[in-house]
From Swiss-Prot:
Protein name: Probable serine/threonine-protein kinase DDB_G0268078
GO molecular function: ATP binding; cyclin-dependent protein serine/threonine kinase activity; protein serine kinase activity; protein serine/threonine kinase activity
Keyword flag Iron-sulfur: no
Species for this entry: Dictyostelium discoideum
Segments forming domain Protein kinase: 4-286
Length: 507
């Protein structure tokens, strides 16, 4: 760690502390996370989920990992330094945030979650303290509790800060998955409008009561699994009927109707009914002008959604919903997407949202060669409903296994294309025209030679002798018939063959 000079400690947690430092050579300010656990070798270090997640998740809305250092059994993560987080920006604020600012923040959080979930990870500890701000750009940090979507449950029941914890986690469910991040986004969005936590419970039971007070208690019709979880732990939901008028309209008077609808969708009890990040991004709440500085290159959304379509992680039986309409109301949508709308007309599966024209980022994971199979994507028709997740089996891409097929290099892809196309090209080639054989003149018959009378008689005698059977040929091969049959004679082996083999064996 001689490369860095420590400045001050800026944070402390259960798993490690964060130190502000400076690179001695370059003068760059960095944030170093020092793990409290001791590690003897690299084999033990690479098993950390945080390392697995940060190595794979490279995105403009995710904090950048610069390097990992193991020194004297201490493990250090070196990140880019981001001074402010969302909690510090709103805790001492007295004036409400503009709606455009809230929209831009939630939009970037959903972009990051969409990238994380489609790459097989969910955060599990989403809260304002872990959302870093640098100008208009937002970045999610602290992946210490991140898990892979395809990892096998049970999971830890005590995760994330209690105020942003999903109901299924509060009920000690160990089979939760990525929708818990969606619940946290809904709680954060409501807090941005009110500048105070939406559900500030003092305990898990108090947290559930505060949720029921605002959202109403779940029923067997709205969340049958939640009723079963509550009964298994001896908990009974309070008898709070959902009000006819959404209470969020009263609690968040500065939020428009679209914002109230989106928060209500994000805070649904049943995790299977919560929208995916991609569906939330298509809500009409975002059908306004978004600053180009926070928009991502189309590939960030296009590639991930094409991956979902290709592997069937998006439910095809989703009906239309006005909240997720396909109207092209966003002025920032890329006009070039019209040229791609005809690519998948025959494909009845839903497609990703329309492209957004932004400068091409420098991230290496956007190289076209690695995603060459995802280039031509139609962006018109989108999976538009967030309510039709109620099925007996787990639907959506949350609880599906992600494709683990390794990406192929362009050279191997070209070789495979040649192996597929070459037989087709050969079949399409016309067969060679067969030329008729050239007619040859018939051979001229030569006249028979003139024989004398004596020669003719000799020739006739030779022909008569050839037609008569010979005595020697008739009885020539009958000597073996009188040979004695051996006692061990087998069917299919003649005695003559047996005598010859026995004589040879004696020799």
């Amino acid at each position: 760690m001689e490369k860095y000079q420590f400045i001050k400690q800026v944070g402390d947690g259960a798993y490690g502390d964060v130190i502000k430092a400076i690179d001695v050579k370059t003068g760059e300010i960095v944030a170093i996370k020092r793990m409290k656990k001791k590690f003897s070798d690299w084999k033990e270090c690479i098993q950390l989920r945080e390392i697995k997640a940060l190595k794979k998740l490279k995105h403009p809305n995710i904090v950048k990992l610069l390097e990992i250092i193991l020194e004297r059994d201490e493990l250090f993560f070196v990140f880019e330094y981001l001074e402010n987080n969302l909690y510090e920006s709103i805790k001492d604020r007295t004036k409400l945030l503009p709606e455009t600012t809230i929209r831009n923040i939630i939009y970037q959080i959903l972009q990051a979650l969409h990238f994380m979930h489609t790459n097989g990870f969910f955060h599990r500890d989403l809260k304002p303290e872990n959302i870093m701000l640098v100008g208009e750009r937002l970045k999610i940090a602290d992946f210490g509790l991140a898990r892979e979507i395809e990892s096998k449950p049970p999971f830890t029941d005590y995760i994330s800060t209690r105020w942003y914890r999903a109901p299924e986690v509060l009920l000690r469910c160990t089979y939760y998955n990525a929708p818990i991040d969606i619940w946290a986004v809904g709680a954060i969005m409501a807090e941005l409008y009110s500048l105070k936590p939406m559900f500030p419970g003092s305990s898990e039971i108090d947290q559930l009561f505060k949720i029921c007070t605002i959202m109403g208690s779940p029923t067997s019709a709205t969340w049958i699994d939640g009723i079963k979880l509550a009964n298994s732990m001896g908990f009974t939901f309070p008898n709070v009927q959902p009000p006819s008028i959404n209470p969020l309209s009263t609690l968040l008077p500065n939020a428009n109707q679209d914002a109230i609808e989106l928060i209500t969708d994000l805070l649904q009890y049943d995790p299977l009914k919560r929208p995916t990040p991609l569906q939330a991004l298509q809500h009409r709440y975002f059908k306004v002008s978004i600053p180009s500085s926070i928009l991502l290159k189309p590939n960030f959304i296009e590639l991930s959604n094409k991956y979902l379509i290709k592997n069937g992680y998006i439910n095809n039986n989703i009906n239309n919903n006005s909240n997720y309409s396909n109207n092209n109301n966003n002025n920032n949508l890329n006009s070039n997407s019209e040229n791609l709308n005809n690519v998948n007309k025959n494909n009845q599966q839903p497609h990703s949202p329309q492209k957004i024209q932004t400068p091409k980022p420098k991230n290496s994971f956007l190289r076209k060669s690695r995603y060459s199979y995802l280039n031509n994507v139609s962006l018109e028709n989108v999976n538009n409903n967030n309510n039709n997740y109620n099925s007996n089996t787990t639907s959506g891409y949350y609880n599906q296994k992600l494709d683990s097929t390794p990406r192929l290099s362009p050279r191997i892809v070209r070789q495979q294309q040649q192996q597929i196309l070459l037989p087709l090209i050969i079949q399409q080639q016309p067969p060679p025209q067969s030329q008729p054989p050239q007619s040859q003149p018939p051979p001229q018959s030569q006249p028979p030679p003139i024989l004398t009378q004596q020669q003719q008689q000799q020739q006739q005698q030779q022909q008569q002798q050839q037609q008569l059977p010979s005595k020697t040929t008739i009885y020539h091969n009958t000597n073996h018939l009188n040979a004695p049959i051996p006692p061990n004679h087998q069917r299919g082996i003649s005695p003559q063959f047996y005598n010859e083999t026995t004589n040879n064996s004696k020799l």
